Amino acid sequence: MVQRNAKPENEIKAIIEAWADAVRRHDLSGILAHHEQDILMFDVPPPLQSRGIDEYKKTWDLFFKYHKPSQAFDIEELAITAGKDVAFATAIMRCGSGTFSGPPEKGGFLFRLTIGLRNADGDWRIAHEHHSVPSTD
C-alpha cells in the first residue's frame, strides 16, 4: 500500500518496490496498478516500443515465460528526482538469479531501468518505462 501525503520520493519508491514485488510474483494486476493508460515503454526484446496499457501488458507474457516466480527481480542503486507534477527514477535491476536477492547466476543479468512518472491530483502514475542493457559489441 502506497502512503499518500508522504514525501514524493518516498511515495515513488513505494510504487517502484510494489511494482518489482508484483513482477517477482507474476502478479499482472499488481504490475499494472500504478501505470498510465497511455504508458510508453522501451524494452530490451522486441518490439522497439509498446504504446498503451494493452501493449505494455502483452510484453509480460514473454518475460514470464523465462522468469520463474522464485527468481530475483531486485532494485539496486535506486535514485529518484521528484518535482510537483513529474518525476523520474533510475535503477540498476538484478534479474533471474536462482533465488530472491541471491547472487547473479548463469542466465541472470543486470539491466538499467528508467521510469518517468506524472502526478495527477496527488496520485503518482508511471507514464514511461525504459529497460536497457549495455551493448557488448
Where are these regions (language model features)?
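A beta-strand edge to alpha-helix "cap/lid" segment located at domain peripheries
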Residues: V2-G30, L40-D137
